[in-house]
Amino acid sequence: MINIPVILVMLGAAALLWGFGIEPKLLKTSVYRIRQPELAGLKIVFASDFHVAPGHERRLRKIVGRIAAQQADMILLGGDFVKGRRFEKSMPIEKIAPILAELHAPLGVYAVLGNHDWRRDGVRIADVLQKHGIEVLENENRRIDRSGGSFWLAGLADCNMRRPDVDKALENAGNPVLVITHSPDIFPQVPERAALTLAGHTHGGQVALPWLGALLVPSVFGKRYEGGLPAENGKRLLVSRGLGTSLLPVRFNCRPEIVVVEFE
């Protein structure tokens, strides 16, 4: 005779083991090929929401190795390098930055800061990253020159803890322009001329159930910008599901990811 309660308990235990002990470590690489003739041949790696906990140095080195293996033209980091909640312990940025400094790309390594970074000490985190060769952008842009033609990269301030200024970030920037931001909630304010906006913050909800999707997405727009590559009003947004966790160290049906963008 089938004992339904026992089976349900076993399934629940297996789900907890998977969500807390296994899936958060199953790093995947998501590749997006985007048609943008002005950027054809450009390869970018985007990684966000590291949330490095104490003792996770080995995991961070694994992530850095996976990013480096892509041999991208440019590396973009979407913020939340640390854990910023009061009840969460975080690896200090002074230990994180030297590992991230092992990342190199012909067109540079750039970053924006996230809400957790600012909860800890955004000024200090930005300063440490800068000293380790990672340029932090906040409401500003850089012209990037390459053999296939120049483009611009604009970085926005976090919309939860700071004041993003899209006009200032794009001031004097030509086309094509890429935009990086921690949270996708600013996306409706990004003009159509942006070739692509890259964001993180949502973690894809961390827990996504079959047929129901993510249970909770930290966005004023709910599941609208949960993850992936949504198109909206002629604009493109790529939302990474992130690398780490927040609130609870759990992921279910939402593996941590490194995002690769190949323009055609």
Language model segments and positions:
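Membrane-embedded segments
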Residues: G41-L137, R143
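Active-site-proximal beta-strand elements of phosphoester/diester hydrolases
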Residues: G41-H51, S150-D158, L178-T181, R236-R241
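N-terminal membrane-anchoring alpha-helices
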Residues: M1-A40
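Catalytic metal-binding/acid-base residues of hydrolase active sites
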Residues: H51, F81-V82, H116-D117, N141-R142, ...
